């Protein structure tokens, strides 16, 4: 009797959060907390990069730093690369070195983000649907299967990514071409090899303990499905503020340099993880959650459900994973085109784009936070079979994303663009106008990335997983690959490297418009037909049965 009453109270508590006379207000109730969650998470990464750039090299901010231009030169002279001093006038310095380390590490960081949401996101979608239709068995299956499979998957992928991480970093700087032209610039060769070595240490720390942020992500999705918006809006942002303090202490007052950032990141992830655990223990004691530890059983994994979870999460994995590939190819081609079309050092434009790309990533992450809030509401409504409300959600989401994106772009690119670049990324006065021009171009992605991804979450939530994969890969591969070679050819033909800078935004715009059209057409013309007469496709029937 008590268990029935407890289940009723849990369901009533959750229903009160999801139900509202105004659907738009319900969406805002979920999107605003996830927006701030994503904003603070991205802001941590953003500020982390700024503090590394500001505090690691010796300057007025850190006069005791051991990382100086001279220390870089001295290390070069003591290396096997040193032949003469003739290459020391290449313009490379310690600040460019640090920016290069951060830049070539970013694709692997994006890949880790893709891995982190693969199982957790699909689990969250299934969990929300099960709560929407009050399916107690499916709720417990999703919780049990999601927790165990996330843990196992996290441990396996850590070792897998570690096995190829250094080779990936090599490719980012096109190391093979440097080796073929060793005599051309021995200091450049030394510079890039050292950057790869330091970046390897940096990513090894993050990869080796990636299970911690992965489990935190699972708890985030499941807590959101239960309507824990207040916790999500307050505790993770506080944890990120603590992260920032730890980064400052390690990069400013230790000799770890860039590595201090990775150590601080892991400590911050651990704090966030412990906050979720403590909160869940509290909810368990008061019997206010479906996420009960006593119901976890290692021998009761529903493998059919795990397949469905993986199929749903695959779209987000494809999106983030393909974006990692996009960044890798973009950086590698940019370095090669800089050599081919300019007299600048190989990483001049790569380091100049550090600020614009970091700001763009911050803005896009915040907008993706909105989508996560929408995904939870949409999954819940799908569980209730309220298809008309899902249509409205799809339209509201595009409007919300464009509105927030416009506000962020006006603030970070137009109003305060130069101030951010000069104050936080140490862009010199002579390069400031060019960097700001690049920033205006690169940040324009924000209008298209999330609005296009809205179609992905719509297809994920309504069991059309193949369509969600297509949407994800359209942005990451289908559009990018042909554009990559088109922009490379135009850049070489015109001998103008600035043409290539437009590639990321052109890719986001074209893919975003295609995906928006695809999602809206399906929602308004085919959705009712699909649910009135579900197709007999074996994959769709399998997902419908086990989700």
From Swiss-Prot:
UniProt subcellular location: Cell membrane
GO function terms (MF aspect): antiporter activity; xenobiotic transmembrane transporter activity
The entry's keywords: Cell membrane, Membrane, Transmembrane, Transmembrane helix
Entries under Pfam families matching the protein: MatE
Record-linked CDD domains: MATE_like
Membrane topology recorded in Swiss-Prot or TrEMBL: Multi-pass membrane protein
Membrane-spanning residues: 33-53, 107-127, 145-165, 203-223, 231-251, 263-283, 298-318, 351-371, 397-417, 432-452, 470-490, 499-519
A GO-annotated cellular component: plasma membrane
Annotated protein name in UniProt: Uncharacterized protein MG447
């Amino acid at each position: 009797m008590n268990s029935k009453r407890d289940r009723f109270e849990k369901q009533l508590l959750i229903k009160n959060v999801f139900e509202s006379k105004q659907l738009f207000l319900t969406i805002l109730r979920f999107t605003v907390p996830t927006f701030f969650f994503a904003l603070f998470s991205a802001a941590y990464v953003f500020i982390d990069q700024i503090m590394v750039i500001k505090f690691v090299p010796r300057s007025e901010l850190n006069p005791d730093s051991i990382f100086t231009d001279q220390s870089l030169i001295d290390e070069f002279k003591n290396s096997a690369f040193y032949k003469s001093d003739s290459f020391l006038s290449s313009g490379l310095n310690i600040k460019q070195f640090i920016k290069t380390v951060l830049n070539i590490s970013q694709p692997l960081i994006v890949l880790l983000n893709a891995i982190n949401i693969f199982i957790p996101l699909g689990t969250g979608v299934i969990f929300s649907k099960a709560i929407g239709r009050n399916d107690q068995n499916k709720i417990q299956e999703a919780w049990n299967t999601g927790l165990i499979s996330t843990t196992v998957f996290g441990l396996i992928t850590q070792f897998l990514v570690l096995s190829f991480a250094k080779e990936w970093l090599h490719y980012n700087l096109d190391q093979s071409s440097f080796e073929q032209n060793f005599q051309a610039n021995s200091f450049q060769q030394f510079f890039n090899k050292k950057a790869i070595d330091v970046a390897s240490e940096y990513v090894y720390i993050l990869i080796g303990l990636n299970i911690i942020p992965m489990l935190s992500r699972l708890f985030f999705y499941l807590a959101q499905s239960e309507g824990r918006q207040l916790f999500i809006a307050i505790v993770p942002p506080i944890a990120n503020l603590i992260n920032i303090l730890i980064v400052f202490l390690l990069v400013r007052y230790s000799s770890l340099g860039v590595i201090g950032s990775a150590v601080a990141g892991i400590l911050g992830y651990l704090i966030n993880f412990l906050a979720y655990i403590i909160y869940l223990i509290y909810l368990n004691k008061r019997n206010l959650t479906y996420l009960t530890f006593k119901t976890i059983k290692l021998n009761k994994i529903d493998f059919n459900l795990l397949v469905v979870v993986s199929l749903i999460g695959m779209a987000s994995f494809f999106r983030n994973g393909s974006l990692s590939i996009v960044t890798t190819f973009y950086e590698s081609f940019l370095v090669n085109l800089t050599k081919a079309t300019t007299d600048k050092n190989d990483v001049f434009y790569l380091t100049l784009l550090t600020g614009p790309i970091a700001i763009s990533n911050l803005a896009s992450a915040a907008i993706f936070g909105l989508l996560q809030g929408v995904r939870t509401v949409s999954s819940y409504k799908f569980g209730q079979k309220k298809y008309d409300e899902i249509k409205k959600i799809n339209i509201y989401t595009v409007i919300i994303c464009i509105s927030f994106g416009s506000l962020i772009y006006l603030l970070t690119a137009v109003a305060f663009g130069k101030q951010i670049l000069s104050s936080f990324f140490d862009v010199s006065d002579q390069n400031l106008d060019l960097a700001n021009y690049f920033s205006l171009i690169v940040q324009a992605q924000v209008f298209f990335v999330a609005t296009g991804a809205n179609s992905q979450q719509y297809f994920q939530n309504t069991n059309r997983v193949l369509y969600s994969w297509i949407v994800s890969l359209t942005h990451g591969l289908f559009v990018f690959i042909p554009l990559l070679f088109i922009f490379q050819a135009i850049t070489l033909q015109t001998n103008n490297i600035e043409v290539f800078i437009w590639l990321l935004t052109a890719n986001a715009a074209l893919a975003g418009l295609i995906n928006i059209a695809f999602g809206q057409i399906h929602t308004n013309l085919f959705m009712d037909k699909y649910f009135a007469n579900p197709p007999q496709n074996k994959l769709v029937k399998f997902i419908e049965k086990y989700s």
